[in-house]
């Protein structure tokens, strides 16, 4: 976590709450859903001809091939590509590499860093952190991220434990 400056009580609590929720409290390093819902998501790069080619070469479709991986659930061709370029791990051709603890945790830290989540964590904005992880943007509504109640409970529990 030091590599990505997840190094204060508020940052650690926020980070753990998000990866705790996204991974089913560290039980699942690959999204449980099939990923088919992501097949036509241009915002994830899954309609890119190269994405379609790579997925097909692996007997899959883009949504299924690049469904959520790792404790923060890196999702989609473009996110796997960006993670690969940043971390030097070929999670484009081998997305399940992010299911391995070292690669997955580094990918989660990278995601945290590139999305500026420390800024929100530093002011205790667990709603903003949750929105950015789950929705990709801050929303006006409070608590509308998927699983917000669990994210908040995990955050509160982490704050009590971390001194």
Regions found by a protein language model. Name each.
Residues 1-20, 24-25:
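Export/targeting segments at the very N-terminus of extracytoplasmic proteins
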Residues 7-11, 64-67, 124-126:
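Extracellular/periplasmic catalytic domains that process cell-envelope and extracellular macromolecules
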Residues 1-5, 14, 61, 91-99, ...:
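Second-shell loop/turn segments in exported
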Residues 19-22, 121-143:
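Acidic helix/loop microenvironments that form the catalytic cleft of cell-wall polysaccharide enzymes
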Residues 132-163:
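Low-complexity, Gly/Ser/Thr/Pro-rich intrinsically disordered linker/tail segments
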Residues 13-16, 72, 106, 110, ...:
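Solvent-exposed, polar/charged alpha-helical surfaces in well-ordered, non-transmembrane soluble domains
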Residues 17-111:
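Peptidoglycan-targeting cell-wall enzymes and recognition modules
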Residues 103-105, 114-121:
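Proteins synthesized as precursors that undergo proteolytic processing into mature forms
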């Amino acid at each position: 976590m030091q590599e990505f400056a997840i190094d204060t009580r508020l940052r650690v609590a926020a980070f753990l709450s998000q990866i705790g929720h996204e991974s089913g409290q560290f039980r699942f390093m690959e999204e449980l859903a099939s990923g088919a819902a992501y097949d036509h998501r241009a915002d994830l790069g899954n309609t890119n001809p190269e994405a379609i080619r790579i997925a097909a070469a692996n007997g899959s479709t883009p949504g299924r091939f690049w469904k959520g991986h790792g404790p923060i659930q890196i999702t989609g061709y473009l996110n796997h590509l960006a993670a690969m370029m940043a971390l030097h791990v070929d999670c484009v051709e081998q997305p399940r590499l992010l299911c391995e603890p070292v690669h997955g945790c580094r990918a989660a830290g990278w995601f945290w860093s590139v999305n500026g989540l420390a800024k929100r964590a530093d002011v205790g904005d667990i709603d903003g952190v949750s929105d950015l992880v789950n929705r990709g943007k801050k929303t006006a509504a409070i608590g509308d991220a998927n699983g917000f109640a669990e994210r908040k409970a995990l955050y509160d529990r982490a704050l009590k434990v971390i001194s």
